[in-house]
Amino acid sequence: MLSIIILAAGKGTRMHSMLPKVLQPLAGRPLLEHVINTSRLLDPDEVCIVYGFSGEKIQKQFRANTDLLWAYQKEQLGTGHAVKQATKLISPSNKVLILYGDVPLIDATTLKTLMSEHQNNEISLLTAILPSGTGYGRIIRRDNAVQAIIEESDASEIERNIKEINTGIMYCDASQLDDWLNRLNNNNAKGEYYLTDIIEMATNDGTKINGIQANKWEEVMGINDKKELANAERFMQKELAEKLMAQGVSLADPNRLDIRGKLTCGTDVFIDVNTIFEGNVVLGSNVSIGPNNIIKNTEIHDDSRVHANCHIEGAFIGKHSEIGPYARLRPGANLSDNVKVGNFVEIKKSTVDRGSKINHLSYIGDAKIGRAVNVGAGTITCNYDGVNKYTTEIKDGAFIGSGVELVAPVIVGKDATIGAGSTISKGAPENSLTLERSKQMTNEKWLRPKKDL
């Protein structure tokens, strides 16, 4: 049986932010969410979050996770004190794994290795070799066995040169852990209760300390400031890009891709540079995404293409469709197969059926467009009276000329044609030409005003 404790009580002063450190975004999700998601891959019986600073914000962020346990650390008295708050809530007969809300890159495979190599009556400790150990407790070994952890503030000059550091991640019996926590003291430079002090305590008790090194030091990086957050972002984006390419996705430049959520791709997908994917995005097979796009919570189906500089959110795009360049699809844009949406077209909360085209400079809002409809350049659905939104319906085969205003609520009939420059407010019957224009006039005696020189 497994209990997981995640420490998330720190204020994160070096972030210089009103947002708690563990809620800072990484790849579109809070730091703590990454750790919780990794925890779930280990199939724990219980997950306990230790919170403190701005705890109400943290709990609100994860209110949908009703299975989480919450332990409050009122005073920031060190990691040992924080873990003690959680051991009051977890089962004493379980094994316990301690993780950190500001160490979001930790891989589930690494944690499974840590636990699989654990023996009874010992502590399994995750360590790492860092280019620089600055900011971390150093691992003290004797005959290759871990003997102690020295916090940097208490380390000698020789000890500070040690590259193997303590990640803080450990695995042991909950009952043993609680016993050691009860024996901690705060006789150190910071006057805090260090979780790391239990290592020396356990060694003195004859308990073996099993130190397991992480494969990549980056996955145990703690995030304390915006620079470290940016470094973690680049590392995670690199990892995500490599996973996509391993699945067969073609990336024009893996270093110029941002995934801020979940991206699912079919076969033979191509993604050009500087595209941002947010939320849950699904790309079907043989989909091509041009450069400089923002795509959020959208499905794009097989053989469709998005040209450069489009903004797409909350949309559904069917097969063999073409979007952009410079198009905007807002939430509720639902496009069927073989649909063309061209440059400077905005679509909001509208359905566009198979084979229809909206090629240039148009606004389509709260509309229902049938099959094989041609919407001319500069067409506007006038859907809002200042209070209410109204629907425009354009039926199959209709042809809308350029510069047309459709004043909703209005219906354009099947195979109807609307003449260019018309303002249509009373509907248009099927199989007919409908146009509405003011009389053209020419004043041959008119003189253009001129500025005084």
Where are these regions (language model features)?
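N-terminal nucleotide-binding beta1-loop-alpha1 segment
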Residues: 1-17
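Hydrophobic targeting segments
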Residues: 2-6, 32, 46-49, 225
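Residues at the starts of beta-strands that form the adenosine-phosphate
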Residues: 3, 45-47, 95, 122, ...
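Short catalytic helix/loop segments, enriched in acidic residues and glycine
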Residues: 18-35
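Conserved N-terminal catalytic core of the sugar/cofactor nucleotidyltransferase
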Residues: 30-109, 113
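Conserved core of the sugar-phosphate nucleotidyltransferase
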Residues: 56, 66, 106-189, 196, ...
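Conserved alpha/beta core of the MobA/IspD/sugar-nucleotide pyrophosphorylase nucleotidyltransferase superfamily
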Residues: 165-266
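Structural signal for interior beta-strand "rungs" in well-ordered beta-sheet cores
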Residues: 250-435, 440-441
